[in-house]
Amino acid sequence: MKLPMSWLKGWVDPGLAPRELGDRMTLAGFELESIASAAPAFSGVVVAEILSAERHPQADKLQVCRVSIGGTELQIVCGAANARAGLRTALAQVGAVLPGDLKIKAAKLRGVESAGMLCSAKELGLAEVSDGILELPAEVALGADLRAVLDLDDPLLEFAITPNRGDAMSVQGLAREVAALTGAALGGPDCEPIPAAVEGASAGSPAQKSAAVSLSAGSACPRFHHRVLVDIDNARPSPLWLRERLRRAGQRSISPIVDITNYIVLELGQPMHAYDLDKIEGGALDVRFARGGESCDLLDGRTVELAPDVLVIADAAGPVAMAGVMGGVRTSVTPETTRVMLEVAWFAPAAIAGRGRRYGLTTDASQRFERGVDPELGRRAIERATRLMLEVAGGIVGAVEVTEVVAEDGAAAVRRAPRVTLRPAEVGRVLGLEMPPDRVVELLSRLDIQQVDGTAHPAAAVGETLTFQSPSHRFDITIERDLIEEVARLVGFEAIPVIDARAVQPIRALPTSQLEEQRLLDLFASRGWQEGVHFSFVDPVLQEQLFPGVPSHRLSNPIASDLAVMRLSLWPGLLRAAQENLRRQQGRIRLFEHGVVFPVGAPEIDRLGGVAVGGRRPEQWGEDEAPADFYDLRADLEALGGLVGQAGGLEFERASLGCLHPGRSARILRNGRPVGWAGELHPRWVRELGFPSAPLLFELDVAALTVEYPVFAEVSRFPQLRRDLAVVLAEEATFSSVLEGVTLSSSGLLRHVFVFDVYRGMGIETGRKSVALGLIFQDKNSTLTEEVIEGEMAAIRAALTLRLGASFRE
């Protein structure tokens, strides 16, 4: 929320410098994000009046203007279409410096001398686009410094508003906080009722009755203020003060009617909408939920297909607005609009929450209605808007009409602020401060939280309670702790003494078989991987591509359409992160993540996953760059075996998973039980996701990585013997099957088996391969003899022949 100091001082004078005020607000829960001036730096720009404007003798699109800055007349060549005699505007004199370090010098344009430049709002950094030179009010003094005239050194404070404080998303809301924190008096603009048929700029037309309004969805919209203004001049530009305030708050000027409705949102926090009364079909509006097949053409140019739970405002021809989110084009105001119907409605937060984001819409209105708008603010807002419209665009007003749903007790069915009970003793216990009850009452009253029951004298009994009425604009005050928080904010969190904790803090024992998370993370970090932390909710489209047909938990109110389901795997988040890194020219990526996944119908599962893209090693001079492959990934995973005390404890079994390359993927096993997957991303998704090469992926259950402590084994004093064996096998045979056959047939003298060559070619049948094994034998008790070794080798050959149909090369 951007807050100009000049606008704030129209409500309350804090008596603090901007930085001091920002620090005080930060400690009260409204973090100061930035302080800036209302305009970029420039100098030497003054107010000037154009005395005459003649066509340039050498250029049709230029004018030669004679301008006055008070006691001096100057000749300026200008190309703006709106340059005309009598206009007061901004003149950059010779020697002036404009934004972007543009220095103004005397110049000759097409043979005519020009002693400066008449400036547009864009050239002064006051607008992104502009149609001509700046037009200033006729009453501003000639020769005055423009920065002083427009107060362009006005500090702009930008605050972060937390989701629970929708009431602070306005100048009024922040002014209330400033007044409460500083003790300064709170003022505000004139919001007194304006009677019907008040004459404005063009008297003579009768005030007309508003369109009829009905509330079919009364629980979602129990109150609807509306009023008609006729003979409005919406073609004139908004006054400079209004355009400037909108600009400083981060909005652009559109037209007087739209500007004023936007101004009310910023000033009071009440979203409102203006309809062209002549475009409302049937002369009536109804607030209801959308019907099947309905759509709405919105002001931003989009057409949305409306779901049945979307609240709309409709006329006889169908929806004209998404209630609380955005208006529609069909009834929008234009420069030709002369009859306007103003709407100030109260929508229940639950009826608006998430509806806009479902369609990719986040508007000023939806942000406020989702958090909760003061149900008692509507009348003040419509009166304030009416007064501004009469001032800016003229016209005649009709009466304010209110359509509302009445509860059984005869009161309006809008939200009723709750009463909250507070134990004064609890304030001291929670905050660690001595706080007499009368002090608590005084602090809360600054926030319009009034005591309605109980005794607040300093010596009140320990067990006594006080009851407070929560103000209608505070949706976040419902329980005792909320009141205690308000007391803490006003006293200042920095005033709460620091007291060392005295509670016993038992430390839970960690099972010896459980792998410490930090050791797991350190292992991958030491092998060149970088840890990532990603959202637990992911893109439903990407997740369906990777795991087609697998159900996911869908969020009812996602923060974005591409973060709408809970993840079934760590891979969607890792792949998105890899894409973002590649877009930022990171050619070699090694990302891993430790987190939980959320299968439907099962508990959360703790997983470790990773993605690798690019070269095997970082680029270097000593060797050519080679892409990483499955075996590089496998080597990193096998290092986990040593971490859990079981070198080689992870097995890799050839298997297929839909999202992985069918010939370059494996199921990961531990002790014969599946614990994860590893492999290349399927070529289809490599292409569709735009990867330059196939990413390598792995994921496994952390719970399977239990630690097995090694058992002491005495080192043999006797020599090792090596024998090599060339085994001819079917092409599809795996090393794990060979290893299994060798180890099961050995008597226990075999210490190590490894592959040192694989051969295909002359002398080997098609469809078969020769795998050369190195076999290391050793006995603990004696030196091995040839007879013993030959017996071992014979047993191994027999086992491989029987199990794998192997033959042997000499």
PLM regions and their residue ranges:
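A carboxyl-terminal module marker
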Residues: E20, L27, R446-I449, T467, ...
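Terminal amphipathic helices with adjacent charged low-complexity linkers/tails
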Residues: T182-S216, V392-V427, L433-E434, L483
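Mobile "lid/hinge" segments at catalytic clefts and subdomain interfaces of large enzymes
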Residues: R110-E123, S130-E135, L146-D151, P155, ...
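Conserved mixed alpha/beta core segments that line enzyme active sites in large multi-domain catalysts
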Residues: V47-V77, G143, R243-E244, T261-R330
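Short, hydrophobic beta-strand segments
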Residues: K2-L8, D154-T162, P222-V230, D364-G372, ...
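Phosphate-backbone binding interfaces of nucleic-acid-interacting proteins
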Residues: M1-P206, M341, R357-G360, D364, ...
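Glycine/proline-enriched, intrinsically flexible loops and inter-domain linkers
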Residues: P4-M5, D23, Q63, T182, ...
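Extended, well-folded interaction surfaces typified by the phenylalanyl-tRNA synthetase beta subunit core
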Residues: V420-I589, R723, I776-Q778, V788-E810
